[in-house]
Structure formats: C-alpha cells, structure tokens
C-alpha cells in the first residue's frame, strides 16, 4: 500500500473511532422504570387519553421515507423496509402505508443476497412485499410533501397514494437518511429544509385531517429540524436520533460486534432506528407508551454513555402518554409480551458515525477484494474520491469563512452554535441562496457536506448576502472538482 493510502487509512480509523469524552453523560439520569412511567401516565398523568384498545376510532396512516441511494447507504432502505414489515404485522393495511425509497439496493450488484434486504445480522428478509409507491426519481421533496398533505392533484408518477386522512385519524411518519443542521437528504434534486417541512406540518394541522401525528426522524443533527420550529398545539410529537449539533450513528457495521454476515461490506441499520423497531418487534404495543419507548431508545442510542447520540423529543410532549398501538398497531403474536424493563433493554450495539459509514464500506470492500482484481481497484478509487471530496468541501468552507470575516474571526463565526431552543437561522431564504451560491462555485455539498449547513447559516445570521458569498466562493474555489461527489448533475441541494 502506498504511503498516501496508509495515511488516509489512519485518518479513517481515527474518524471512525470518534472522540470520546469521559465527562459527558448522554443518557442522563431521567430514565424511569417502565412500571413507574406506566402508573404515572395511566393514573393521573393528566390530559385526554386516546382509547388505544378501540380499533374503530380513526385510521392509522404511515409515511416511510428513505432519503438516500447507493449501496454504501444500505441501512436507510433497510430501516424503512423493516418499518413496513412491523406496521403490516401491526395490522396496518397497504392502502394506508406510503413508502418512499430509491429501490437500488435489493438487486444491486453489490448485494450478496440478491432480492433480499436485512436490518439485523441474523434478521429475516424485510424487502419482500414492500410496496413500490415512490421509487427512483419519484423520491422527491415535492412528492413527499404532496403525499403528507393528501394532495393527489400535485402528483405525477408513483402509485398516487396519499395520506387521505380524516379528523379522527392518527399519522406516523418515519424518515431515515443523512442530514445536517436544518436539512434532510434526498436521493434526487433538492433536500428537505426544516422551514418547509414545518410549514407542511402546519398546513396538515390547519386542514383538520388528523387527530395526532408522530414523527420519528433518523439523521445527523436531526434535532435542528424541530428545535425552535415545532411548536406546541399542532398535536404533533416528534423524536430525533440526535440533538441539533451531533451525528447520528450506523450500526451492525463491518468490524463491529455484532456485525453483518461476513459477505456484507456495509452497515445494516441505524442505531436509533433499530432501537425503536427492535423494541416494537417484541412487545404488545397496547401496553407500551411513546414515552416509555423514547426513554428506552434514548438509553440504547446513547450506547450506555459511550459512542452514541442524544435522542430528543419535540412538539406536544403530552402525546407521549399514548400507547404505541395508536400509531403502529401491534403484532398479535406479542400479546403476552407486556413491556417491562427486564425484557426491554438489549445489549449495547457498537456504532459508526453516520458520516463515516460510506468510508467504512469502501475500505471493507477494498480489504476483502482479492489482490489485482477490478473490484479492489474500484474500491480504492471510491475511497479516495470520497476522501478527496471531503477535503475539498472542508477546505473551501473554512477558506470562505476567513475571506469573509478574517483569519481569527472566521472559524469562530462558522462554528457558533445558537442557544438551545433557537432555530438554526433567521432567514431560511438566505440559507438556501448561500447554498446555491456555494455549490455554483465549489460543487455539490453532498451527504458529507451537509455538516457545514450551520456554517452557512451563521454567515446568513451575520447579514452576509449572495453577492459577498459569491465573491468569496469564487476566490476559494477556482473550479468544481471532477469527482462524482461534487457533481451537480442532479441539480442544487437547495
């Protein structure tokens, strides 16, 4: 291996290890015993209680969205397929489940089990039977918003299914992909921005076409999508894989314990996602509340105070007293498996930073490929292309900060984090404009570059506009790199 390859490998290993801070406390000390929580919420916790035992009260609806493509992002579509199987076993009908996924994983040439997707090292196929509602180029922001709003006339392509809900219905939305401060990835064209998503949820509430809505969100910095934006009073309860400033984590990854079967070179799931689904898989969900699951997922996703993230909750927290059955149904096979602490907390899972999972895939693919084969050469090329793109984006953003604010003030302004409870940016239109300006001169941010959204938001918050940003970007980037990660073939991300 060349010196450069060795150096990059060391960089990768350091990145995958993360930064351990022995003083931090991810899980905190607020985990109640499930029995105590159950008594609190059912014997005087306050507020109106949904009759979770009455199937005749409203219809359950679900929207499941995997926002990525590419085999290195296997885990996101695996999460979504697993969620579909869980909901079907819970009694939801296909007509009430809308699935968005690119669908390039099951029959991908990299898949060691063609036509099969697994979400656990010893798991069953979760791909079989999943409806192809919106796949490929139909997985767009516009179609997702139209589906949530029940706007059939805005749809072309796909199955045409929408959330055609009524005032007594309950809606569950689950998203899994990469994210960044204020933004969620999509496999086509532009990304989902927090202000637009919140506007859609407000419109859905104003229509009077649901009784309550639960949103589970798997992405890096996912707390920033709701923090300071999702207000009480919309009958919406949301939990996120991480707070507004940190990465979420992939799990069941190569080299970890437990890891995927040896023929796999990619992570099978995401830590927050498998935490809530593996909990739901084994319990009678008539006896478990959203709050109980939140606490359990919070503990497991924190990896018991090692590597992990802070699971957060937003919106109408009072809805968390509702049983999961209200949104997910329940598998009759679990009728005798009441939620109690002794059978709920699973062993800790090792995890990989969400943004490093693609590098891990390329490295594992390279490591396993026989010497001198095209596969080994391809893996090496993919690895170096990804690393080169990362270095380009990081350098460009840092240089733009210094050009705009000076060598000393630049890093300080770019890295500023607003106090908890405040939204990421004052002017979302400015943020989107600066994203387009940066990408016009420097190339696509990509799933990795989304991490710099806070820096671009901070530039907006200082009053810098499009013209000054264009001038600095032109100085920082003489041209757009030719690699696939920088390509703008699919358009701008804003």
UniProtKB/Swiss-Prot annotation:
Signal peptide positions on this chain: 1-20
Keywords: Disulfide bond, Glycoprotein, Hydrolase, Protease, Signal, Thiol protease
One of the protein's GO biological processes: proteolysis involved in protein catabolic process
Glycosylation sites: 151, 336
Tissue and organ distribution: High levels are seen in the flowers, a lower level expression is seen in the leaves, while very low levels are seen in the stems and roots.
GO function term, MF aspect, one: cysteine-type endopeptidase activity
Enzyme class label: hydrolase
InterPro entries tied to this protein: AE, Legum_prodom, Legumain_prodom_sf, Peptidase_C13
Disulfide bonds: 253-267, 430-460, 442-477
Presence of the UniProt keyword Hydrolase in the record: yes
Site-annotated residues for Required for post-translational maturation and enzyme activity: 267
UniProt xrefs under CDD domains: legumain_C (cd21115)
EC number: 3.4.22.-
Keyword Disulfide bond: yes
Active site positions: 178, 220 (nucleophile)
Family: Belongs to the peptidase C13 family.
PANTHER family, per database record: HEMOGLOBINASE FAMILY MEMBER (PTHR12000), VACUOLAR-PROCESSING ENZYME GAMMA-ISOZYME (PTHR12000:SF50)
Role played: Asparagine-specific endopeptidase that may be involved in processing of proteins targeted to vacuoles that accumulate during ethylene-regulated processes such as flower opening and flavedo degreening.
Stated name of the protein: Vacuolar-processing enzyme
């Amino acid at each position: 291996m060349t010196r450069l390859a060795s150096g990059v490998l060391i960089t990768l290993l350091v990145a995958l290890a993360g930064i351990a801070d022995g003083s931090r406390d991810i899980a905190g000390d607020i985990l109640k015993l499930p029995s105590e929580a159950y008594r609190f919420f059912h014997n005087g916790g306050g507020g109106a209680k949904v009759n979770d035992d009455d199937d005749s009260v409203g219809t359950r609806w679900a929207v499941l969205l995997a926002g990525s493509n590419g085999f290195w992002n296997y885990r996101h579509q695996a999460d979504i397929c697993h969620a579909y199987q869980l909901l079907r076993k819970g009694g939801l009908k296909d007509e009430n489940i809308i699935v968005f996924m690119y669908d390039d994983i099951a029959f991908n040439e990299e898949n060691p089990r063609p036509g099969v997707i697994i979400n656990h090292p010893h798991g069953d196929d979760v791909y079989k039977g999943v409806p192809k509602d919106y796949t490929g180029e139909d997985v767009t922001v516009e179609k997702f918003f139209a589906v949530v709003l029940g706007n059939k006339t805005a749809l072309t392509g796909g199955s045409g299914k929408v959330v055609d809900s009524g005032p007594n219905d309950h809606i569950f939305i689950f998203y899994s992909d990469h994210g960044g401060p204020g933004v969620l990835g999509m496999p086509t064209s532009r990304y989902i921005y927090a202000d637009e998503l919140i506007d859609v949820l407000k419109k859905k509430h104003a229509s009077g076409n649901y009784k309550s809505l639960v949103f589970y969100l798997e992405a890096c910095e996912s707390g920033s999508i709701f923090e300071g934006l999702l207000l009480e009073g919309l009958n919406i309860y949301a939990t996120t894989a991480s707070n507004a400033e940190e990465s979420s984590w992939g799990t069941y990854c190569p080299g970890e314990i437990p890891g995927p079967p040896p023929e796999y070179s990619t992570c099978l799931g995401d830590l927050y996602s498998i935490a809530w689904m593996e909990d739901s898989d084994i319990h009678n969900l008539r006896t478990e509340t959203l709050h109980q699951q939140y606490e359990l997922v919070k503990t497991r996703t924190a990896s018991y105070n090692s590597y992990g993230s802070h699971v957060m909750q937003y919106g109408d927290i009072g809805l968390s007293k509702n049983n999961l059955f209200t949104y997910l149904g329940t598998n009759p096979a679990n009728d005798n498996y009441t939620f109690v602490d002794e059978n709920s907390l699973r062993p800790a899972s090792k995890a990989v930073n969400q943004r490093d999972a693609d590098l891990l895939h390329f490295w594992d693919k390279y490591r396993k490929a026989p010497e001198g084969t095209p596969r080994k050469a391809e893996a090496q090329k993919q690895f170096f292309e990804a690393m080169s793109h990362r270095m380009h984006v990081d350098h460009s953003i840092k240089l733009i900060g210094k050009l705009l604010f000076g060598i000393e003030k630049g890093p300080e302004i770019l890295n500023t984090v607003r106090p908890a409870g405040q939204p990421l940016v004052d002017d979302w239109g400015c943020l989107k404009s600066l994203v387009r300006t940066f990408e016009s001169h420097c190339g696509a941010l990509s799933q990795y570059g989304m991490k710099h959204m806070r820096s671009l938001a901070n530039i907006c918050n200082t009053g810098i506009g499009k013209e000054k940003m264009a001038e600095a970007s032109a100085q920082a980037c003489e041209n757009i790199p030719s690699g696939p990660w920088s390509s703008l073939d699919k358009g701008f991300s804003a």
